[in-house]
Amino acid sequence: MVGSVGNGLVDLGGAAVAVNGVGKGMRPEAVAVAMEVESPPRPAEEEGEGSPTRREIVLGRNVHTASFAVKEPDADDEETGEREAAMASVLALYRRNLVERTKHHLGYPYNLDFDYGALGQLQHFSINNLGDPFIESNYGVHSRQFEVGVLDWFARIWELEKNEYWGYITNCGTEGNLHGILVGREVFPDGILYASRESHYSVFKAARMYRMDCVKVDTLISGEIDCEDFQRKLLLNRDKPAIINVNIGTTVKGAVDDLDLVIKTLEEGGFKDRFYIHCDGALFGLMIPFVKKAPKVSFKKPIGSVSVSGHKFVGCPMPCGVQITRLEHINRLSSNVEYLASRDATIMGSRNGHAPIFLWYTLNRKGYRGFQKEVQKCLRNAHYLKDRLKEAGIGAMLNELSSTVVFERPKDEEFVRRWQLACEGNIAHVVVMPSVTIDKLDYFLNELTEKRATWYQDGSCQPPCLAKDVGEENCLCSIHKK
């Protein structure tokens, strides 16, 4: 997915002068030491008239848009305390920037409504969950008792008994996908990976890392996998097992693949005992269980693994995730590590031991009913946003089981960056999370409609047609508007 969010430090760069400069609200004497925000001038082609409205992303170029310099303390710094004062000023400025950016956070699926003040006392400890969560190692400063409690909770949600699952808390959602696909590859070493074109980029990263043959499957207009195309491509490779990534909420459109139809397609195609399914539930994997009449993601079905992100719907302040697979598969990956006096079947080595505690804390505070209320609120507010957009004459789409509202990409990239909207081609989206209130949506909608009126007021250009992206019924361009 092509993102449109600027480096947060750029905003700070606007609030501080590069060398011995002064940030907004900062006393000159507090910053007049060697604490710098380094921000190089913009390339000439980005300035002046005729510059492109969309930023060009150039790979292979180490461009430092902004940075806080790291410099050696002065010899007398312990006596003067200037260094500490300068760092405190930079951190205060950065915090104000975070507060401001959080007010305009809509395009990425992070729940910013949390309070973990009670856990501050644990920040004094280096908590590291090395190795297998279920095996005690020589390292004693860990949180595996919290980790296993969290894993048991997710195993219950996905209907897998304690003695039948294995899992761990990952460092991010991508790691869950890397692990799930790796397990599939170990179960079927010559298997082909199938994933819809709208799968998260980490799925295709896994294919490159593991040097797997990968087949991209077409999608429906909703973003859901096209099982007719899936069937055609399966039959072209019927001599090799299938490893399938099933999306429980695609990145851009929030589409949920039809798991039951995927399984039916595999079985009818002659792959009954020759497939492994990994479910990427980064965001909606934890929302779907609380949606009435939604299809179940369950290990009672022939799936191999499920992963979710912990920093998205749950609202953990640091990136993390949960990966659950069947115990019968894990020995193919596991190996003894004498250094740890444990076994290891994870992707990473050291793992954040604080994350399981944050997850455990939230799961205990909210419980099943709490999450159910938050899911209902998100879906209700997402429908509100979609309806308001359409009332304003802006094409929009909302999938049935989703809180991701897809709509016409704003013409002004400054507006995109201000609201941190995720964009792809002619579309952008807002992901309605528990922290997104009706008031915030109204604020966004009012600003969008006001700005949009100026973008198209002279008639020199028209809003883009979204029919190919969201379907004719959801497009409100001059051609499809009824």
From Swiss-Prot:
Stretches for region Disordered: 36-55
Reaction equations catalysed: L-serine + H(+) = ethanolamine + CO2
Enzyme Commission no: 4.1.1.-
Modified residues annotated as N6-(pyridoxal phosphate)lysine in this record: 312
InterPro entries: Group_II_Decarboxylase, PyrdxlP-dep_de-COase, PyrdxlP-dep_Trfase, PyrdxlP-dep_Trfase_major, PyrdxlP-dep_Trfase_small, Pyridoxal-P_BS
Domain of life: Eukaryota
GO molecular function terms noted in the UniProt entry: pyridoxal phosphate binding; serine decarboxylase activity
One annotated GO biological process: carboxylic acid metabolic process
Keywords: Decarboxylase, Lyase, Pyridoxal phosphate
Annotated binding of substrate, by residue: 200
PROSITE patterns per record: DDC_GAD_HDC_YDC (PS00392)
Residue ranges crossing the lipid bilayer per the database entry: none
Cofactor dependence: pyridoxal 5'-phosphate
SUPFAM superfamilies referenced in this protein's UniProt entry, alphabetically: PLP-dependent transferases (SSF53383)
Family: Belongs to the group II decarboxylase family.
Function of the protein: Catalyzes the biosynthesis of ethanolamine from serine. Decarboxylation of free serine is the major source of ethanolamine production in plants and ethanolamine metabolism is crucial for the synthesis of choline, phosphatidylethanolamine (PE) and phosphatidylcholine (PC), and thus for plant growth.
PANTHER family: PTHR46101, SERINE DECARBOXYLASE (PTHR46101:SF2)
Name this polypeptide is given: Serine decarboxylase 1
Gene of this entry: SDC1
